[in-house]
């Protein structure tokens, strides 16, 4: 598993991401490596403290078969989607769009967009619409993404 992030754990992450208060200020990749190794000391992990850009995306992600996108920023999501679909034809992309707010969790779903692009979320809600991100909807969208990754590994490509 390859983990890539440039950000540090902030108090606003604790209610919806898998970090602990003792990890505040740590780089997210380092904190997540620690947490995953507590769960499974045999896991193979590669961590990069980096911001994914047009210039480095292919290099950073070339070792992955499946790319699971978890950006906050819509422009970054679009950049990664465009890069993977246009320059990495052997990769699957599982992305997320629309998990903010207090809408029903039943609106979150996963769609197969192309033979190697899956999109999880409600495709409508936006963090700027008011209430922001709430843990249950974020967790459900992440679970959709994780399950889609497992299905791709199992060669079950339909949703």
Where are these regions (language model features)?
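Adenine nucleotide-associated cytosolic modules
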Residues: 1-159
């Amino acid at each position: 598993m390859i983990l890539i992030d440039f950000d540090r754990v902030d108090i606003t992450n604790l209610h919806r991401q898998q970090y602990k208060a003792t990890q505040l200020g740590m780089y997210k990749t380092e904190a997540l490596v620690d947490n995953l190794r507590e769960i499974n000391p045999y896991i193979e992990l590669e961590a990069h403290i980096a911001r994914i850009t047009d210039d480095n995306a292919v290099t950073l992600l070339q070792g992955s078969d499946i790319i699971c996108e978890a950006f906050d920023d819509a422009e970054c999501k679009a950049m990664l989607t465009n890069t993977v679909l246009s320059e990495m034809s052997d990769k699957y992309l599982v992305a997320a769009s629309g998990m903010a707010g207090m809408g029903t969790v039943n609106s979150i779903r996963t769609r197969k967009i192309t033979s190697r692009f899956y999109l999880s979320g409600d495709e409508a809600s936006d963090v700027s619409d008011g209430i922001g991100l709430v843990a249950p909807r974020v967790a459900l969208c992440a679970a959709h993404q994780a399950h889609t990754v497992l299905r791709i590994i199992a060669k079950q490509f339909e949703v």
